[in-house]
Amino acid sequence: MILIIYAHPYPHHSHANKRMLEQAGTLENVEIRSLYHLYPDFNIDVAAEQEALSRASLIVWQHPMQWYSVPPLLKLWMDKVLTHGWAYGHGGTALHGKHLLWAVTTGGGENHFAIGSHPGFDVLSQPLQATALYCGLKWLPPFAMHCTFICDDDTLQAQARQYKQRLLAWQEVNHG
């Protein structure tokens, strides 16, 4: 099962993430958990989140990039849900062998994230990749949708279909 942990503080403003979720939602065995919908008060149900993670083979962290990082509720979710003795540390093997995909949208162009005056995309992904590896997850190459503020609808739809194809390809390889 694919579990999408979706974190967008203003989901009604995001045409890109909306289209990505619509495309992903057409696949079988996909569960979408919208953190800002489930936890508007930031009071995360750790047991429910850990149960959802336990059912998944592929975990997707989908969100807009905010200040070169994750939105605050996703960071809190990581702090609360990925606990010692469950996700890492002595006895913390619940996530071992599962895959993790970082699916991120950005307002800037892909060239904005080239090494130079701004941090490169590989550099920006390092904290998430390190978290994944620490928890025994298999890190997959990220999926990024760039220029989402200026893309026309056809471009957003095409990129959202690429996202769906990426998930479908994972399903075909891993679950035949």
UniProtKB/Swiss-Prot annotation:
Q: How does it sit in the membrane?
A: Peripheral membrane protein
Task: Kindly list the biological process annotations in GO that this record carries.
Answer: positive regulation of potassium ion transmembrane transport; potassium ion transport
List the GO cellular component terms: plasma membrane
Record's Pfam families? Flavodoxin_2
Out of the domains of life, which is the source?
Bacteria
| Binding-site residues for FMN, renumbered to this chain | 8, 14-17, 65-68, 105-108
Record's catalysed reaction(s): a quinone + NADH + H(+) = a quinol + NAD(+); a quinone + NADPH + H(+) = a quinol + NADP(+)
Primary location: membrane
Q: Does the keyword Glycoprotein belong to this entry?
A: no
Q: Report the locations given in the UniProt record.
A: Cell inner membrane
Xref: InterPro entries:
Flavodoxin_fold (IPR003680), Flavoprotein-like_sf (IPR029039), K_H_efflux_KefF (IPR023948), KefG/KefF (IPR046980)
Q: What is its EC number?
A: 1.6.5.2
Q: Name the cofactor(s).
A: FMN
| GO molecular function terms attached to this record | electron transfer activity; FMN binding; NADH:ubiquinone reductase (non-electrogenic) activity; NADPH dehydrogenase (quinone) activity
Keywords, sorted A to Z: Cell inner membrane, Cell membrane, Flavoprotein, FMN, Membrane, NAD, Oxidoreductase
Identify the enzyme class: oxidoreductase
> HAMAP family per the record?
K_H_efflux_KefF
> Could you say which protein family the record assigns here?
Belongs to the NAD(P)H dehydrogenase (quinone) family. KefF subfamily.
Fill in the subunit field for this protein.
Homodimer. Interacts with KefC.
Q: Tell me, what does this protein do in biology? A: Regulatory subunit of a potassium efflux system that confers protection against electrophiles. Required for full activity of KefC. Shows redox enzymatic activity, but this enzymatic activity is not required for activation of KefC.
Q: What is this protein called?
A: Glutathione-regulated potassium-efflux system ancillary protein KefF
* Source species: Salmonella heidelberg (strain SL476)
Identify the gene encoding this protein.
kefF
